[in-house]
Amino acid sequence: MMTTLRKLPLALAIAAGVLTTQAMAVDFKGYARSGIGWTGSGGEQQCFKATGADSKYRLGNECETYAELKLGQEVWKEGDKSFYFDTNLAYSVSQRSDWEDVTPGFREVNVQGKNLIEWLPGANMWAGKRFYQRHDVHMIDFYYWDISGPGAGLENIDLGFGKLSAAVTRNSESGGSYGYLDNELDQRPTVNDTFDVRLAGLELNPGGTLELGLDYGRANAQDGYSLADGASKDGWLVTAEHTQSILTGYNKFVLQYATDSMTSQNNGRNQGSTIDNNGKMIRVLDHGAIDFNDQWAMMYVAMFQDIDRDNNNGSTWYTVGVRPMYKWTPIMSTLLEAGYDNVKSQRTGDRNGQYKVTLAQQWQAGNSIWSRPAIRVFATYAKWDEKWGYATSSDAEGNPGLKAGTAYNDTSMHTFSRGNDDEVTFGAQMEIWW
């Protein structure tokens, strides 16, 4: 009995050590931003985005608290084979008070298996909800290739000259499928699937690589239900991206072409089972970030996007912007962001334009333009001149001449745009990723 009692503390100590080691192996990653701001004419901070543009210049122009909290762990490993469990809980609130009710969203819940197929060394197998190989422009928070969602796939298959990835993901619409239930017309959500194939790591020149992608999206109505007449049932997206290393940074040049339902979000997610989005989209994009030396760094973007819809409800969007950074010390810097957006309506022929300039003093954890966490104080000036906008559901109620989601010119009776105005905002913000 005494021998058993002496062994018990030793067993408990070993178990505690094992549990502690496992707990320390949990990966905690994430992103967050939050702050406080005011508008020169009074009230809380306003944020500025050109009507018809898909994004806005974000420095000193974010009016919400947003966070992504990621927990993950390698739960099994044997040799070079392993399983990794990954999660991501995200939320967004308007940062107006201490307690703000919010329903968090599980953006990611997936398992990734590495080297599980003997004849495909280095390949990863995965299933679940996932941020899948997203491509974005950070300074305008613009995701131009993003099929994230529930799905499954096989990635990083080494072909010798490049790496092949294949996946299927899903992003469904709230309605769009019509049928009859008990002899009454019934509308149900429509499943939208995207089938994605990518070939990456193609070496074209010293320091330069090419990635090619093909995405096919389709609406998948359940048995006994069909899509609305004229709805966009499917579409394609073709992407070519060249990445060039420059000093300690990079430049990315992107060409994209989309058809029909893939012109709805223009990022690889198809949509349109409830609307007619048949047509085509062409995008030419160049963006990058470079740390030139210990004093200077810069982000930049220039893009042309043309959406030509069969229903004449497309648009042409130009945007160009820069964000130079001067580093006073390894942890203190000054940033100036200047951006211009111009959006022409295919239906009205008129343009909406906006200039936005932000000056920020920043303290960050390091001397790179990517160093975070950062605390910044900022002042923003925006000026816009708009002549058209999209009708809302409330606009269309009781007015048979208007259709929600359709572009219209401003008139003396109704204003759809923000008009012609300017504004100043100022405040403080923190931003972190880890």
From Swiss-Prot:
CDD domains (UniProt xref): Maltoporin-like (cd01346)
Site feature (Important in sugar transport) residues: Y143
Main location: membrane
Inducing stimuli: By maltose.
GO cellular component: cell outer membrane; pore complex
Biological process according to GO: monoatomic ion transport
Signal peptide residue numbers: 1-25
Residues carrying the site annotation Greasy slide, important in sugar transport: Y31, Y66, W99, Y250, W370, W433
Keywords: Cell outer membrane, Ion transport, Membrane, Porin, Signal, Sugar transport, Transmembrane, Transmembrane beta strand, Transport
Mode of membrane association: Multi-pass membrane protein
InterPro entries: G_neg_Bact_CarbUptk_Porin, Maltoporin, Porin_LamB, Porin_LamB_sf
Origin: domain of life: Bacteria
Recorded GO MF terms: maltodextrin transmembrane transporter activity; maltose transporting porin activity
Catalyzed reaction equations: beta-maltose(in) = beta-maltose(out)
Subcellular localization, as worded in the UniProt entry: Cell outer membrane
Job description of the protein: Involved in the transport of maltose and maltodextrins.
UniProt subunit comment: Homotrimer formed of three 18-stranded antiparallel beta-barrels, containing three independent channels.
Similarity annotation: Belongs to the porin LamB (TC 1.B.3) family.
Name of the featured protein: Maltoporin
Provenance organism: Serratia proteamaculans (strain 568)
Taxonomic path: Bacteria, Pseudomonadati, Pseudomonadota, Gammaproteobacteria, Enterobacterales
